[in-house]
Amino acid sequence: MVQISEVKGNGRDNRITTHSHIKGLGLKEDGTCESVGGGFIGQEKAREACGIITDLIKSKKFGGKGVLFAGGAGTGKTALALAIAQELGPKVPFCPMVGSEVYSSEIKKTEALMENFRRAIGLRVKETKEVYEGEVTEMVPEEAENPLGGYGKTISHVLLGLKTHKGTKQLKLDPSIYESLQREQVSTGDVIYIEANTGAVKRVGRSDAYATEFDLEAEEYVPMPKGEVHKRKEIVQDVTLHDLDIANARPQGGQDIMSMMGQLMKPKKTEITDKLRGEINKVVNKYIEQGIAELIPGVLFIDEVHMLDIECFTYLNQALESTISPIVIFASNRGICTIRGTEDIQAPHGIPTDLLDRLLIVRTLPYSESEIRSILQIRAKVENIILTDECLDKLAQEGSRTSLRYVIQLLTPVSIIASLHGNKEIGVQDIEECNDLFLDARRSAQVVKSSSGFLQ
């Protein structure tokens, strides 16, 4: 009997994360929203407010402004920020960070903030390039007497024939391009393109007219290019200002032994100077004026903003008012608390009032029991877990008593317990067993209180 077996692909399954079920804000065309949409349950006012913010970002009328998501733990502040990122699409830069990220022994706090600011500002560069593209029909190097004397001869120029469906052209190329042709191992029958401005050569592949040839080396066969040999191509590149900073702060190169040793050693984080950033800003502004580039203000999301200190907040006041600035979204789950870095100055959300005045504040509300039930239903579907109505009710009650995060974290352990019992569906007894194994924050605190005499 012939044995046939299926080969499993080696591609990894997408990891299920806390916000895997969030697909967007779930708004209608008129900007209003229903209670269920885009993976969200409830928070209608907050989602509608985020919809308006998204429209302002898309129309580029919201640069250098700030938004604060204020609400209790587990009310969907991070989910709203991720939904805004998904609504904006992959072309708009979105840079998430946590307030405690700025504290480092290598670079200053303000430098870490500015790095993330620059990561959240995109630059779309449009460049029109003249290229010669086609199948190589001939490649003849022309030799001449060596101008430096001696017996050897040098290559004065190269005659290159290129063919497309529309016609053929013979080009007379510089000897430096011949070196590039040799480096790319170009031969007759290859499809190549040459940039007219830089002389860069790129071998696309072998022409499909030669596909019947027997070759030991695996070749990529490509069709003969359409259109003329000489054509203009518009190339669009998306970069962030931080990419430009890094490229200029750490230029690669140097063939001496010290340069090579420096590359082998563990690189220390480079602090980019304000002078360098100023020079890059000048070049960027020049490109924007010439119409070569377009500035795309993205979104910087700072979670747990109360972890920043008074120095960072003072710096943020200045950074928000600069000409090149992204949209900054803050999130905090604190009420009235002491501003970090001060001894007795208290402020709402741990943010100084002068910065709070500059922000639009969006409030997120705690979830009701029915909303927790609906969220659990969506999460169970994402994680491929089958829950009965009784189990959903039980978990929703548990969620309103403890927290939404706790019951979401229970879903996977409960499904494992049910499978150990040989059940496909999760039962109430599985939830109770899981409850006994894993404590929530309140029960854990009670245990610590009752055993304070034993635990030191």
From Swiss-Prot:
Entry's Gene Ontology molecular function annotations: ATP binding; ATP hydrolysis activity; ATP-dependent chromatin remodeler activity; DNA helicase activity
GO cellular component: cytosol; Ino80 complex; NuA4 histone acetyltransferase complex; nucleus; R2TP complex; Swr1 complex
Keyword Transcription among UniProt keywords: yes
InterPro entries reported in the protein's UniProt record: AAA+_ATPase, P-loop_NTPase, RuvB-like, RuvB-like_C, RuvBL1/2_DNA/RNA_bd_dom, TIP49_P-loop
E.C. designation(s): 3.6.4.12
Location(s) in or outside the cell: Nucleus
Domain of life: Eukaryota
Principal localisation: nucleus
Record-listed ATP binding positions: 71-78
Signal peptide: none
Keyword annotations: Activator, ATP-binding, Chromatin regulator, DNA damage, DNA repair, Helicase, Hydrolase, Nucleotide-binding, Nucleus, Transcription, Transcription regulation
Record's catalysed reaction(s): ATP + H2O = ADP + phosphate + H(+)
Subunit structure comment from the entry: May form heterododecamers with RVB2. Component of the SWR1 chromatin remodeling complex, the INO80 chromatin remodeling complex, and of the R2TP complex.
Job of this protein: DNA helicase which participates in several chromatin remodeling complexes, including the SWR1 and the INO80 complexes. The SWR1 complex mediates the ATP-dependent exchange of histone H2A for the H2A variant HZT1 leading to transcriptional regulation of selected genes by chromatin remodeling. The INO80 complex remodels chromatin by shifting nucleosomes and is involved in DNA repair. Also involved in pre-rRNA processing.
Alphabetical list of PANTHER family matching this protein: RUVB-RELATED REPTIN AND PONTIN (PTHR11093)
Protein name: RuvB-like helicase 1
Name of the gene this protein is made from: rvb1
